[in-house]
UniProtKB/Swiss-Prot annotation:
GO terms for cellular component: endoplasmic reticulum membrane; membrane. Residues 96-398 are extracellular. Belongs to the serine esterase family. Its main location: endoplasmic reticulum. Residues 1-74 are cytoplasmic. The chain crosses the membrane at residues 75-95. Its EC number is 3.1.-.-, 3.1.1.23. It catalyses: 1-(9Z-octadecenoyl)-sn-glycero-3-phospho-L-serine + H2O = sn-glycero-3-phospho-L-serine + (9Z)-octadecenoate + H(+); 1-(9Z-octadecenoyl)-sn-glycero-3-phospho-(1'-sn-glycerol) + H2O = sn-glycero-3-phospho-(1'-sn-glycerol) + (9Z)-octadecenoate + H(+); 1-(9Z-octadecenoyl)-sn-glycero-3-phospho-(1D-myo-inositol) + H2O = sn-glycero-3-phospho-1D-myo-inositol + (9Z)-octadecenoate + H(+); 1-(9Z-octadecenoyl)-sn-glycero-3-phosphoethanolamine + H2O = sn-glycero-3-phosphoethanolamine + (9Z)-octadecenoate + H(+). It comes from Macaca fascicularis. The gene is ABHD12. This is Lysophosphatidylserine lipase ABHD12. The active site is at residues 246, 333, 372. GO terms for biological process: acylglycerol catabolic process; monoacylglycerol catabolic process; phosphatidylserine catabolic process; phospholipid catabolic process. It is a single-pass membrane protein.
């Protein structure tokens, strides 16, 4: 009995051991399977996170682009609206065009004392004020010939006025729009002319610089006439030449036409960078480029100029001028196109009023870079003036 029992016990032990072994293997397999699934979940999560981040980044970028495009569209619509509104605004308010032509509110250089021309290197210049009309006062500079600069030190206005009766010729300079009589390029021209032995008298029109009054073509012309008469009353038989630059050429031809009509013409007229008339100049000006082909350009932009009483008709005035005429123009002038100066010459040269006087056109090559206001730099300018102002016989040349 003991022998039979022992095998049975051993068999049970083997079965238990086998069962235990089987159970451990299953547990191990189950544990391995759990770890594998966990690893797979972790791996899947790690791959999904970059994809989600990329999607979010793309959405943000698209949002920024959309916002930028909306802002850009808004800006474009505003610019377009302004572009369309400006012509109507100018048509309804012609005074805007007048301000853009005169630009008297632009005072360059800033922070200079016009009462002290010596601060601009003009140490032989006197500042004083004249009154062309009631409630109108204009500031004037009188620069004597450079050879007198030592004698001029400390002298008063009376000395300068008496000096006009000396044997030196006088140039009345009429500046263009914007700035004052103290503008840098203007001061440099005064110095050149003074070094050549001329008196230079210049002034700011009413509404410019420290001059009092409201700008207008009539007012500017009257101011110039008043200064001319003031000079003639003190200069005796000395030659008086009138020099106009840019917009000042319009004032100059207005003045000289009036002087010729009253039979008191100047000894010569010099026009630097002139135009034919203000309508053609406005149409050719760089500011008009963006509107030049705008429907109704003349009606919107040019007619308001005329309705404001602004013409500056050089092309008409030269037909009534009887004195020598010199025209100076740089080929690279970006403000008053060179062809307008040449066109003015072609109108003046055959005019009957000039049949007894010389008319000369002097171009300056674009390579020289004199542009609109630097002709004073030309080393040829002294010779040109000396030869032109020294001649008296009728002559047309260019």
């Amino acid at each position: 009995m003991r022998k039979r029992t022992e095998p049975v016990a051993l068999e049970h032990e083997r079965c238990a051991a086998a069962g235990s072994s089987s159970s451990g293997s299953a547990a191990a397999a189950l544990d391995a399977d759990c770890r594998l699934k966990q690893n797979l979940r972790l791996t899947g999560t790690g791959a999904a996170e970059p994809r989600c981040a990329a999607d979010a980044g793309m959405k943000r970028a698209l949002g920024r682009r959309k916002g930028l495009w909306l802002r850009l569209r808004k800006i474009l619509f505003c610019v377009l609206g302004l572009y369309i509104a400006i012509p109507f605004l100018i048509k309804l308010c012609p005074g805007i065009q007048a301000k853009l032509i005169f630009l008297n509110f632009v005072r360059v250089p800033y922070f200079i004392d016009l009462k002290k021309p010596q601060d601009q290197g003009l140490n032989h210049t006197c500042n004083y004020y004249l009154q062309p009309e009631e409630d109108v006062t204009i500031g004037v500079w009188h620069t004597v010939p450079a050879v007198w600069w030592k004698n001029a030190q400390g002298k008063d206005q009376m000395w300068y006025e008496d000096a006009l009766a000396s044997s030196h010729a006088i140039i009345l300079y009429l500046h263009g729009n914007a700035g004052t009589r103290g503008g840098d390029h203007r001061v440099e021209l005064y110095k050149v002319l003074s070094s050549l032995g001329y008196h230079v008298v210049t002034f700011d029109y009413r509404g410019w610089g420290d001059s009092v009054g409201t700008p207008s073509e009539r007012g500017m012309t009257y101011d110039a006439l008043h200064v001319f008469d003031w000079i003639k009353a003190r200069s005796g038989d000395n030659p008086v030449y009138i020099w106009g630059h840019s917009l000042g050429t319009g004032v100059a031809t207005n003045l000289v036409r009036r002087l010729c009509e009253r039979e008191t013409p100047p000894d010569a007229l010099i026009l630097e960078s002139p135009f034919t008339n203000i309508r053609e100049e406005a149409k050719s000006h760089p500011f008009s480029v963006i509107y030049r082909y705008f429907p109704g350009f003349d009606w919107f932009f040019l007619d308001p100029i005329t309705s404001s009483g602004i013409k500056f008709a050089n092309d008409e005035n030269v037909k009534h001028i009887s004195c020598p005429l010199l025209i100076l123009h740089a080929e690279d002038d970006p403000v008053v196109p060179f062809q307008l100066g040449r066109k003015l010459y072609s109108i003046a040269a055959p005019a009957r009023s000039f049949r007894d006087f010389k008319v000369q056109f002097v171009p300056f090559h674009s390579d020289l870079g004199y542009r609109h206001k630097y002709i004073y730099k030309s080393p040829e300018l002294p010779r040109i003036l000396r030869e032109f102002l020294g001649k008296s016989e009728p002559e047309h040349q260019h």
